[in-house]
Curated annotation (Swiss-Prot):
Source organism (scientific name): Neurospora crassa (strain ATCC 24698 / 74-OR23-1A / CBS 708.71 / DSM 1257 / FGSC 987)
GO MF annotation list: porin activity; protein transmembrane transporter activity
Pfam family, one: Porin_3
Record's keyword annotation contains Metal-binding: no
UniProt name for this protein: Mitochondrial import receptor subunit tom40
Source organism superkingdom: Eukaryota
Subcellular location: Mitochondrion outer membrane
Subunit and partners: Forms part of the preprotein translocase complex of the outer mitochondrial membrane (TOM complex) which consists of at least 8 different proteins (tom5, tom6, tom7, tom20, tom22, tom37, tom40 and tom70). Interacts with mitochondrial targeting sequences.
Entry's family note: Belongs to the Tom40 family.
PANTHER family hit by this protein: MITOCHONDRIAL IMPORT RECEPTOR SUBUNIT TOM40 (PTHR10802)
Length: 349
């Protein structure tokens, strides 16, 4: 809070009864707030992280053959490059990636065989504030995204702009504001506001979504109510030190396309489990539409080689997909010795 000397013309803004009353009320509110023992509830993007990112394998599935070769040149700061070769559905035949990271900076670039370039650059201003940028050129989907994130003692807030522009004589793009507040040591409530306009010939669209997250000792439950009428709920539980399971349910209600009108209901429920062996990780899931998927990651002893096997079977369409990948992480002996005694970096991913 700014301070002014008694001789400053602006001192009257501070030396008055109204300012003193507001300052005392704010300080009392902050002290009362600390007594609740609240902690940071995370962010809106990671509200169902344990289920959707850690347990379920939807984000890990692929079909075909893939080989990844990663070479690390430095650990502090982190600098590595990777080459990916692939044959399969929705996989680029070749992609090159470079990554650089410190406690303050994260930079990553990807270039595929068709010339599509995507970059990410994050900068940490302090322990709680990060600015994130993303750019992609080529592939028919040019995109620019800017995000500023702040993590407080008991809340998180972020502002995001996707393809913002004034070139058409007015503001266009997508703008998103997130806020998640811990209301008890276990419960967090939040909302997300979206404002978007594709062109000046169209009016802007606005939407508000609501979020809730409850975290107990060994289980987490979350709920998301989207502005379009979709409801997503998830439940995650840690069964043992090596086994965790989760269920994710999505229900949406939309106007019917038929002549009679009315509403149509669509929903899907997915159950998944993850088991961590000593040298491998196994994930499996099945959904209410009859699709069974599994993924096995196997590390080959002390060698920096990981084999991944993926498979899914759709019992309704009678279709099956298989995938296999080999990942090799190459580094010099000196880097391996440095890794044993080096402190881990807190990179702002």
């Amino acid at each position: 809070m700014a301070s002014f000397s008694t001789e400053s013309p602006l001192a009257m803004l501070r030396d008055n009864a109204i300012y003193s009353s507001l300052s005392d009320a704010f300080n009392a509110f902050q002290e009362r707030r600390k007594q609740f023992g609240l902690s940071n509830p995370g962010t809106i993007e990671t509200i169902a992280r344990e289920v959707q990112r850690d347990t379920l394998l939807t984000n890990y599935m692929f079909s075909g053959l893939r080989a990844d070769v990663t070479k690390a040149f430095s650990l502090a700061p982190l600098f590595q490059v990777s080459h990916q070769f692939a044959m399969g559905e929705r996989l680029n035949p070749y992609a090159f990636a470079a990554l650089y990271g410190t406690n303050q900076i994260f930079a990553q670039g990807n270039l595929d065989n068709e010339g599509a370039l995507s970059t990410r650059f994050n900068y940490r201003w302090g322990d709680r504030t990060i600015t994130k940028t993303q750019f992609s050129i080529g592939g028919g989907q040019d995109m620019a995204q800017f995000e500023h994130e702040h993590l407080g003692d008991d809340f998180s807030a972020s502002l995001k702009a996707i393809n913002p522009s004034f070139l058409d004589g007015g503001l266009t793009g997508i703008f998103v504001g997130d806020y998640l507040q811990a209301v008890t040591p276990r419960l967090g409530l939040g909302l997300q506001a979206v404002w978007q306009r594709q062109g000046l010939t169209q009016g802007p669209d606005t939407a508000i979504s609501y979020f809730a997250r409850y975290k107990a000792g060994d289980w987490v439950a979350s709920a998301q109510l989207q502005a379009q009428g979709a409801l997503n709920t998830s439940f995650w539980k840690k069964l043992t030190d090596r086994v965790q399971a989760g269920v994710d349910m999505t229900l949406s209600v939309a106007p019917s396309q038929s002549m009679m009108g009315g509403l149509t209901k669509e929903g899907i429920t997915t159950f998944g489990a993850k088991y961590d062996f000593r040298m491998s990780t196994f994930r499996a899931q099945i959904d209410s539409k009859g699709k069974l998927s599994c993924l096995l990651e196997k590390r080959l002893g002390a060698a920096p080689v990981t084999l991944t096997f993926a498979a899914d079977v759709d019992h309704v369409t009678q279709q099956a997909k298989l995938g296999m990948s080999v990942s090799i992480e190459a580094s010099d002996v000196d880097l391996q010795e440095q890794q044993e005694g080096a402190q881990s970096l807190n990179i702002p991913f």
